[in-house]
């Protein structure tokens, strides 16, 4: 996903978990746009997402670990193999992490 002002404006509905997941997947691009291009909107979204990830009570420890690995580029199957759980379990926990973040940010 290309990060530009149009994309940011249309993807700033935090109450929608699908939007939050797309933004999380673009976290590095948001950081790059904020730091190297001076995009204040990207910076605000980056800070919001990072704050939600680290806010007490938003994510469980497993959700945090799996989400970070997914954001680092590991597939759900690779994460599952590392922790000896099924890919469906990883998918479930990542999706719930995104929903929790969406609820936190959407309020």
Q: Over which residues does each language-model region extend?
A:
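Short amphipathic alpha helix immediately N-terminal
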Residues: 56-74
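DNA-recognition helix of helix-turn-helix
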Residues: 83-106
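Charged, low-cysteine interdomain linkers and short loop/connector segments
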Residues: 1-43
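Hydrophobic positions on the alpha-helical face of helix-turn-helix-like DNA-binding modules
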Residues: 66, 78-81, 90
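Intrinsically disordered, low-complexity basic tails/linkers immediately adjacent to helix-turn-helix/homeobox/MYB/SANT
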Residues: 14-17, 21, 99-107
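Amphipathic alpha-helical segment used for protein-protein interaction
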Residues: 33-61
């Amino acid at each position: 996903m290309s990060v530009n002002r149009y994309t940011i404006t249309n993807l700033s509905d935090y109450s929608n978990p699908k939007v939050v997941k797309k933004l999380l997947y673009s976290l590095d691009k948001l950081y790059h746009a904020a730091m190297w291009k001076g995009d204040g909107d990207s910076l605000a979204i980056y800070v919001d997402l990072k704050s939600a990830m680290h806010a007490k009570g938003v994510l469980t420890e497993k959700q945090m670990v799996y989400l970070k690995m997914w954001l680092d580029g590991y597939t759900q199957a690779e994460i599952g193999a590392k922790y000896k759980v099924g890919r469906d379990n990883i998918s479930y926990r990542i999706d719930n992490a995104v929903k929790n973040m969406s609820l936190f940010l959407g309020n």
